[in-house]
């Protein structure tokens, strides 16, 4: 599989686990606004508590560079993975998606042709609404199912990989399949923790098996 230039916005549990997974086979630039986190990542010291990230930092040859320079990270990226925080306000029943939107705006400024993949937790219907709001169709959504301190493990052994994309656009259909294959390429295999109910649910979708991992592409 060819190598792709990848940028990851955010180095929390989701962002750093995805960056680590993808950096096994592709050049990855991880963007954060906190200098100390970037310095730690470049020294292969995990800024978060995660046994598998620490293990991969110590043992794997990762093509991973952390940077504060969003332009340098985004301008040549084929894919930009957005893992910015979206804090939930239970009183207002509201996800703060402003950090996600700032990343999207920067990507559109520096590299309007890049495929943007949102990994942040977002409200239902948000991806389509942000496509319409920005006029940018190149926005996909790929939800994460991760536990804190087990984020990379859950990324290496996913129960499923889901990529949402607009229907009827062959280029974005291809981009969604390519991104899913990048995740499969870095993964080890399917989680064994699925319930029979979950497996039954997965069979109702048009799934493909890769390393035993179901891939679901949704409009």
Predicted regions and their residues:
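Structural/interface elements that position substrates and couple domains in central-metabolism enzymes
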Residues: 1-219
